[in-house]
Amino acid sequence: MIRAIDKFHELDKGVMGVVRAADVYALHVIAKIRNQKIDMDVINSILSENKISGLNLVSYAYTKNELKQLEEKGHFTEIGQQIIVATHTALESYLILKFREYYRHLTLGNNEGIVEETLSRLNFRCLNDFKDAYKKFFKIHIPSFDVSYHSSDGCNFEPENSWEALILIYKARNDIVHKGVSLDYKVSTLMDSWYPFDFVRRWVSGFDANFDSHIYQNRETRLYREYKERAISNGISI
């Protein structure tokens, strides 16, 4: 069976491909707005070296007038929203497969047929379903797990903590899929899709390493101890 983290990396690679395609498109759009020639050296580095341009990372890559135009005309909105949907898909896949990994590990020696039947009956329809199931079966309180993260000035991705970030991404995905557009979270520049994607990569990496140590080795990392203290201080029994 494919490991959750390996599947995530596979999906992550696909999302990164869309990010790079959006980057190339963005460079053409910005060059047209500025009435400049396209920087083919930058495009070649994106295509051949798996790099991204500063348009994804910093607000000062755009002028105020450019930011206004991008928001009004929505040049990057549709492709940025698809990056957010794909990011959510990768995250959801990881959480489902990780749950199965931990459940199978903790039920080793039990009737395999019953274990698999139990897993087949579990249905994760929303973020709170993951929160409840991880807490019930593994005493993992997802809202208390926080990774250090920051975005750039001018980016609309400004969650106060990791749980708020996950909720933002989940809601944006639902709005895009069911209503055609993200209503509360604006996707105007490449930063608005890059930073949610980059956050999920960091969150999954941290979650996988720290909870694997706890579940498989009964070892508490520094980040796990911080998570535990945070949960207990909020009255959560873990």
What positions do the PLM features span?
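A generic signature of intrinsically disordered, low-complexity regions enriched in glycine/proline
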Residues: 16, 27, 43-48, 96, ...
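Polyanionic, low-complexity intrinsically disordered segments
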Residues: 2-13, 26, 161-175, 179-238
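Helix-loop junctions and short alpha-helical segments
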Residues: 37-170
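Terminal, compositionally biased low-complexity regions
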Residues: 1-47, 52, 103, 229-238
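A generic structural signal for solvent-exposed, polar alpha-helical segments
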Residues: 14, 31, 100, 136, ...
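Intrinsic-disorder-associated interaction segments
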Residues: 1-11, 15, 19-22, 32-36, ...
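Short, surface-exposed, charged/polar-biased interaction segments
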Residues: 29-32, 36-43, 104-112, 116, ...
